[in-house]
Amino acid sequence: MAEAATGFLEQLKSCIVWSWTYLWTVWFFIVLFLVYILRVPLKINDNLSTVSMFLNTLTPKFYVALTGTSSLISGLILIFEWWYFRKYGTSFIEQVSVSHLRPLLGGVDNNSSNNSNSSNGDSDSNRQSVSECKVWRNPLNLFRGAEYNRYTWVTGREPLTYYDMNLSAQDHQTFFTCDSDHLRPADAIMQKAWRERNPQARISAAHEALEINEIRSRVEVPLIASSTIWEIKLLPKCATAYILLAEEEATTIAEAEKLFKQALKAGDGCYRRSQQLQHHGSQYEAQHRRDTNVLVYIKRRLAMCARRLGRTREAVKMMRDLMKEFPLLSMFNIHENLLEALLELQAYADVQAVLAKYDDISLPKSATICYTAALLKARAVSDKFSPEAASRRGLSTAEMNAVEAIHRAVEFNPHVPKYLLEMKSLILPPEHILKRGDSEAIAYAFFHLAHWKRVEGALNLLHCTWEGTFRMIPYPLEKGHLFYPYPICTETADRELLPSFHEVSVYPKKELPFFILFTAGLCSFTAMLALLTHQFPELMGVFAKAMSDIFCSAEFRDWNCKSIFMRVEDELEIPPAPQSQHFQN
């Protein structure tokens, strides 16, 4: 019964929609016919005469007040529309018209929409999963104590947001802890330290973990089987405590490097011991996974310290060795550190070799990969590139490849060119970035701006060609050219990652709908007329009379000119030529 009732209601609704869509003229004439028949019982003539009498008795002040009230209501609607547009990025009236009025007028077929939703469900879910805004660890992140804190001491501004630091705390708990940490006192202390919000409390906990390891303890390990001779050993050093001190307490890169070297000595020993025991159970396997993450992190940060201190070749060697030793750990994105160091050495052939390995369609892209590929192709033609010459003779094959590479990079992250061309000021990059977002653009430009400046003409080529990308993707939120559509959620995530004193770059820029602009103009013009009429009624009356006379005279002049032209055409009409005498009979 319920299904039958539902089907009957759907049929009734479809009939009503069909009647409103195709038979609106019939409905209109039916209404007029009913009004004509019921004109006597409804006393329409008397009501019309009463209304006309009421309107004739109204004074000009009433119309002024009515105009002012309508202007006030229009202004309130405009303010609400502007607020709704700033918050949600769309017009409220347009959304209501499309979402509610259009289905009532028969613009949407429920059956077809359901079928399309069921058939395209997989593609929609894939689109959502791809466009989901995932936050990534910045592979080129700075040191808190030696770089971020020094910036705070000088400027008084906090370069990191609470959301960014909270993500870092979650990363540290994921990389540097495991379920068996409670069995070792130092690791148990560090497990609590990574959750601590106060920096001084974290540093104190790291010192406490190191002090525990200074106590000599008797480890019951027989030197000889079935022997009563015991060896006295020192507890292994806590590598994660050294990591925390190097990241947050060290005020210079040199101090951080010393602490990381001590962490490397402790972490390497723990890694070798857990490597031998990893197959003895899930607990040992988790410890080995944790020790591997700790060792990779320490070596990567040591390479970054060498890069900061000017030992670039040493840093490149350390990064290459680390990538060979742990090829499966791609979550640290060490290849991006390697690309930046190779660009500093101007080893462009090695950079091309790294790009050939990582610039693959199956791997996730980044601004570093896309813009480095564009830089290499621009380097081949940028020194001889001239916009005037290119407009005359056209682009060569190499120039076309460079322009296409720039368009590809700009489509992936459209925020980078403004920082490379110094149209926007740079800030310290955050510890986490959003791919294709403003945070990734800042992180890339902060380290790679010098490499673009070093290549002669590269920034000039970028300046001349980067805006051409937007003509290829007129609707970037709906359809991309080489990549997926640009995600909508980048602005919100970037505002969480970047400090409040930075103006977040928004793409694509939200433009005010025509309805809001038209309402604003009409409201302002009507309010101005009402105010002038109230203040200067006689002058506005003269002005209105003059405008009506002008329009009437203009219409009369147009009609008079047309009549004159018609008379002239009639008078200038050429009569037919007489026949020649040679053809008369």
UniProtKB/Swiss-Prot annotation:
This protein's GO CC annotations: membrane
Keyword Endoplasmic reticulum: no
PANTHER family registered for this protein in UniProt: SUPPRESSION OF TUMORIGENICITY 7, SUPPRESSOR OF TUMORIGENICITY 7 PROTEIN
Residues annotated as transmembrane: 15-35, 62-82, 512-532
Classification lineage: Eukaryota, Metazoa, Chordata, Craniata, Vertebrata
Gene behind this protein: ST7
Name of this chain's protein: Suppressor of tumorigenicity 7 protein
Membrane topology classification: Multi-pass membrane protein
Keywords assigned: Glycoprotein, Membrane, Phosphoprotein, Transmembrane, Transmembrane helix
Keyword Signal: no
Compartment(s) where it occurs, according to its Swiss-Prot or TrEMBL record: Membrane
Protein family according to the UniProt entry: Belongs to the ST7 family.
Glycosylation site residues: 47
Phosphoserine modification, residue list: 386
